[in-house]
């Protein structure tokens, strides 16, 4: 209880600080947020599950985003963002106060550099090509069902995004994973990632690489063996106006000693997955998402899965939208994939069971 009260006091203090800053320095600090709640009904293995969920299409969150003009085209920037569960009022993820993003940096003609808890180039590419109207990389997107979370966000990191030149820009991230944590290998979770984005008119393409140190053992010590997994990601899209189409393809290699299960925090078996998806706009004044994707486990085809979805997004206003859809996961005998929320797990399934899920929800931005 004391820990919760301390977090509430910190949150209240930060909101008061943001309000004071807004009054004294115009709009250099912005308080923002999103609340998303939905009803899901899932059918799997002869069982029906009905539940109220948070963060299905858009992760429920609040945050502070700020900047200070330092002169000469240079600005100090920061972002603090906390995820929460709208259906229960609890803090999401690992329970940290700012579990989504927490960084400070500098922005200038060179681009932007950030130090703290940052997104990787892979995650930015997932967002760019796993399409959606109310939000991207969300309920219904195949990539959202298959992505390995530790490759998306990394603490103790430095992130650099260059200024665009000729339609191209570069993203770089370096992170110390365990960062000296007692009882873990010193290099566990160390991450190095680079990506390039190119935009020309209505066409966009990304290519990314990420390597991450993992352990092959579930019980960790400072002397546990550590190896390096390597991820290769490619994405592309084209926007015709009424229709936008996109595709993602990712390979994971060099997962020494990892065959069918995640054995430690950063361990992930060799696999490939892809998603092809499209947005069709102006359908009954809303937008339809169509998504299909497949996951292939390199060591054993019994771990394969396929994902199918259709979702309808409708804006009630600039800040409020509603959505509804149906999605299906077809698991091979050893796979346990579900239709995941934008933040948080989907309805659980047993190994080899298929899942069909219906959803209806509302999202509001402030």
Ranges and model annotations:
Residues 1-25:
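Gram-negative bacterial Sec-dependent N-terminal signal peptides
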Residues 18-24, 62-70, 108-112, 162-166, ...:
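Outer-membrane beta-barrel proteins
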Residues 26-42, 49-177, 188, 196-204:
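Outer membrane beta-barrel
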Residues 47-51, 145, 180-182, 219-223, ...:
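Extracellular loop and loop/strand-boundary signature of outer-membrane beta-barrel proteins
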Residues 187, 193-314, 326-328:
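Detector for outer-membrane/organellar transmembrane beta-barrel domains
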Residues 316, 350-366:
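Outer-membrane beta-barrel "beta-signal"
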């Amino acid at each position: 209880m004391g820990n919760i009260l301390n977090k509430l006091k910190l949150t209240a203090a930060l909101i008061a600080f943001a309000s004071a800053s807004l009054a004294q320095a115009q709009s250099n600090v912005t308080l923002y947020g999103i609340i998303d709640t939905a009803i899901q009904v899932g059918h799997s293995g002869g069982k029906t599950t009905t539940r109220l969920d948070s963060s299905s299409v858009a992760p429920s969150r609040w945050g502070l985003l700020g900047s200070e003009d330092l002169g000469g085209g240079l600005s100090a920037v920061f972002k603090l963002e906390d995820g929460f569960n709208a259906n229960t009022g609890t803090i999401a993820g690992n329970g940290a106060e700012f579990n989504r993003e927490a960084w400070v940096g500098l922005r200038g003609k060179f681009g932007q550099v950030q130090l703290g808890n940052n997104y990787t180039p892979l995650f930015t590419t997932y967002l760019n090509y796993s399409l959606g109207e109310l939000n991207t990389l969300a309920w219904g997107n195949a990539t959202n069902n298959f992505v390995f979370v530790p490759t998306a966000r990394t603490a103790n990191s430095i992130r650099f995004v260059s200024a665009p030149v000729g339609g191209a820009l570069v993203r770089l991230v370096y992170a110390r994973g365990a960062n000296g944590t007692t009882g873990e290998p010193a290099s566990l979770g160390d991450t190095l990632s680079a990506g390039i984005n190119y935009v020309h008119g209505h066409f966009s393409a990304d290519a990314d690489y990420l390597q991450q140190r993992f352990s092959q053992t579930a019980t960790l010590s400072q002397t546990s063996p550590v190896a390096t997994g390597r991820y290769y990601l490619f994405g592309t899209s084209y926007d015709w106006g009424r229709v936008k189409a996109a595709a993602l393809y990712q390979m994971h290699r060099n997962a020494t000693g990892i065959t069918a299960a995640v054995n430690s925090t950063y361990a992930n078996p060799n696999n490939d997955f892809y998603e092809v998806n499209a947005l069709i706009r102006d359908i009954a004044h809303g937008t339809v998402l169509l998504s299909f994707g497949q996951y292939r486990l390199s060591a054993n085809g019994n771990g394969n899965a396929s994902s199918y979805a259709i979702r309808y997004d409708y804006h009630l206003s600039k800040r409020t939208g509603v959505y509804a859809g149906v999605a299906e996961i077809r698991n091979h005998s050893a796979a346990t994939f579900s239709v995941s929320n934008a933040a948080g797990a989907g309805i659980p399934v047993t190994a080899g069971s298929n899942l069909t899920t219906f959803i209806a929800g509302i999202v509001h931005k402030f």
